[in-house]
Design a protein with these regions (language model features):
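Short, small-residue-biased leader/transition segments that mark boundaries at the very start
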Residues: 2-9
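Residue-level signal for inorganic ion chemistry
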Residues: 10, 64, 86, 128, ...
C-alpha cells in the first residue's frame, strides 16, 4: 500500500476505536522496519511491538499478547481484540467489534471472531461455516473453517450460510498466553522475543482458530473491503494515476502509483496495477494481485527507503568491488529540531556532505555548526551525531568491508 494511503486508514481506525470507546488501550504489532513509520503516523503514546523477523500472523499475535501479559502486566482475564489496522469499512464494523468483546466477556466462547456477510463468491478469503445461533442473539457457533477455496466451493459455502473470515478475533489474554507457553516456556517478554524464531511460521487461523474447541462468530453485514490486495485498494482510488505518470487514452482499468522521481509511461495497458517505490517496482494483472505475497517473501533485501522518527532516508546507490570493499550511498532528511542518535561504527567509515539546511554536529564530544556545502569525514571508532536546526539534507557515503545496520553502538547525549 502507498505510504500516504496507509497513513489515512490507520489514523482513521484509531480515531474510530477511540470514539466508540471499545478499547482502554491500543497496541500495534508490526515489523521492525515499520516501527518509526507507525510512530510518525499515530504518535508515541501508542505502544508498538516489533517482530524480530517476519513469521506470519500467529507469531505476531503471540508476541503482542506476551508483551501485554509480561511487559504491561495485564490481567489474564483482560479481553484482547486482534484486528487489521487498515480496513475500509463503516461505523457498524466497530459496533460489531464491541459485540465480539462482549461475547467473550459473557463466556459465549473462548475465541470469538467477526464474520463478514459475503457479497459474491471469492477465492481470496477464508470462510467460516456457522451452525446454531447462541440463544438467538445473532452469535453463531462455528462448525468449520475453509481457507481460500476454489470458486465452485466458495459458491457452495455461501449457499450454506458461510461468512468471510474478517480477520478480527477476541479472546481473554490468558487463553493466548497458554498457547504461547506450549511453544516457549517462559514468563518474560524479552526471552520470548529473543526466541521468536521458535514459533511456527503459520497464520493465526491455522494454528489457533481451526484448532479451537470453543469458537463463535458474530456476523457483520455492512460495507467492508479487505484493502490487503491491490485490486480492492485501487477500487477506492479516485484517480488512476498518482505521481509522475503518463497514460494514453487507450489504457483501460490501469492504476499507477509512482513514488519515484522517474516518469512511468503506460501505452495501451489493460487491467494492470503498477506501483513504483525505492524498494522496487510491481507490475501485476489486477486479478492476480492477491498472489503478490507468495513472491514478495522471496525478496529478502535491505529497505531502500525508511521513515524514522527523526525524518527519512533513501538508498541512492550500492556497490561492491573486486576486493570485497563495499560502498553504500544514502540521502537523509532530518526534521527541524530532531537528531540522530550519538553513535559509533566499528567496521565502516562515513563521509557526510550537507546539501541543504543548518545543524549542529558532534564528533567525539566536540560540537560545531554545519550548513550547506560542508563535508565531514567520520572514521570508524569516532562517535558522532547531528541535530537539525532547520530541516537538514545530506548525502552519506558508507565504505568498508562490512556494511550492516547492526554495526552501530549508541550512547546518551544531551543537546
Amino acid at each position: 500500500m502507498s505510504r500516504g494511503l496507509g497513513d489515512v486508514y490507520k489514523r482513521q481506525v484509531v480515531r474510530q476505536l477511540r470514539e466508540t470507546g471499545i478499547c482502554d488501550s491500543i497496541t500495534v504489532a508490526t515489523s521492525q522496519s515499520q516501527r518509526d513509520i507507525i510512530i510518525n503516523q499515530l504518535g508515541e503514546e501508542i505502544p508498538v511491538v516489533t517482530e524480530p523477523e517476519r513469521r506470519d500472523t500467529f507469531p505476531a499475535i503471540a508476541l503482542a499478547s506476551s508483551y501485554l501479559a509480561y511487559k504491561r502486566k495485564c490481567s489474564t482475564d483482560e479481553i484482547i481484540i486482534v484486528m487489521p489496522c487498515d480496513p475500509y469499512t463503516e461505523t457498524g464494523y466497530f459496533e460489531t467489534i464491541r459485540r465480539i468483546a462482549d461475547a467473550v466477556k459473557n463466556n459465549v466462547a473462548e475465541l470469538v471472531l467477526m464474520g463478514i456477510n459475503p457479497t459474491y463468491p471469492s477465492a481470496k478469503y477464508g470462510y467460516v461455516v456457522p451452525v446454531n445461533d447462541v440463544q438467538n442473539k445473532g452469535i453463531f457457533q462455528v462448525s468449520r473453517f475453509t481457507e481460500k477455496p476454489d470458486m465452485i466451493t466458495a459458491e457452495k459455502l455461501i449457499s450454506e450460510g458461510a461468512f468471510w473470515n474478517g480477520g478480527v478475533f477476541a479472546f481473554r489474554l490468558g487463553y493466548m498466553t497458554d498457547i504461547v507457553t506450549r511453544h516457549i516456556k517462559t514468563d518474560t517478554f524479552s526471552e520470548i522475543r529473543s526466541r521468536y524464531g521458535e514459533f511456527p511460521k503459520i497464520s493465526f487461523d491455522y494454528e489457533v482458530a481451526e484448532k479451537a474447541q470453543s469458537v463463535a462468530v458474530v456476523p457483520f453485514a455492512g460495507e467492508w473491503k479487505d484493502l490487503g490486495t491491490w485490486n480492492t485498494l485501487t477500487d477506492e482510488l479516485s484517480e488512476h494515476t498518482m505521481g509522475n505518470v503518463v497514460m494514453d487514452e487507450e489504457s483501460e482499468n490501469t492504476h499507477v502509483i509512482n513514488e519515484l522521481g522517474l516518469p512511468i509511461m503506460c501505452i495501451g495497458t489493460r487491467n494492470l496495477v503498477i506501483a513504483a517505490s525505492n524498494d522496487g517496482i510491481l507490475i501485476s494483472d489486477k486479478d492476480k494481485s492477491e498472489n503478490i505475497k507468495t513472491y514478495a517473501d522471496c525478496l529478502q533485501h535491505r529497505p531502500m527507503f525508511e521513515e524514522r522518527r527523526w525524518g527519512e532516508y533513501k538508498v541512492v546507490d550500492t556497490a561492491e568491488f573486486s576486493d570485497g570493499y563495499k560502498s553504500l550511498t544514502k540521502q537523509l532528511k532530518i526534521k527541524s529540531g530532531k537528531s540522530i542518535s550519538y553513535q559509533v561504527h566499528r567496521h565502516r567509515d562515513e563521509v557526510w556532505t550537507f546539501i541543504d539546511g543548518e545543524g549542529e554536529l558532534v564528533l567525539d564530544d566536540i560540537r560545531s555548526v554545519i550548513s550547506r556545502g560542508d563535508t565531514i569525514t567520520i572514521k570508524k571508532g569516532v562517535k558522532h551525531a547531528v541535530r537539525a536546526i532547520s530541516e537538514l539534507t545530506f548525502i552519506e557515503v558508507q565504505s568498508g568491508n562490512l556494511l550492516a545496520e547492526e554495526d552501530i553502538e549508541q550512547f546518551d547525549y544531551k543537546w
